[in-house]
């Protein structure tokens, strides 16, 4: 997948959403550092030109700046990725600065923060109230000032996305945040149409579920009627020559 995408995109984010769309977890909270490293290694084997960023999962960086550095440095050393991403509440500013000062490129994440879904009230758009909108803007500015090279803006209104983009001097990458951001990102299985239900902000650019379903149906039918394997799929015995 990474090899196919590589020539068409500037950046590949190995996001902790893989816990839900690949491993079937109910949220990103159960994703481990080992899972992120495994998937990061796989992406790095396929990607040759895109900037590869790997998420630090829940519980791997919040306890202290030192914990964050240990996790981030391990991810970078074991995967070979170029940067890490952390969700950026007010608590994260000092952590971002600490990491950047020690050579870890950091992408931040504001707005809807899936790792904090239990305290934010679930997966829903953020910033519809003035107080929360102001908090999102402040978090983005703080993350930029702390040294983040880019910020993901998720699940906010067009107005908030525009304010964030205008307020920071780093690229804003939107997901459910309108075209007011400098760039866009989507969860690949969502974008490829692997699931019936996707968030409102997703556009399905393919219908992989239908293609896969039809392929499996055809395969099963041909196995049952013995039309597969056919002549083109067989190896022929060749008697040894004396």
Spans of model-derived segments:
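Alpha/beta enzyme core
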Residues: 1-240
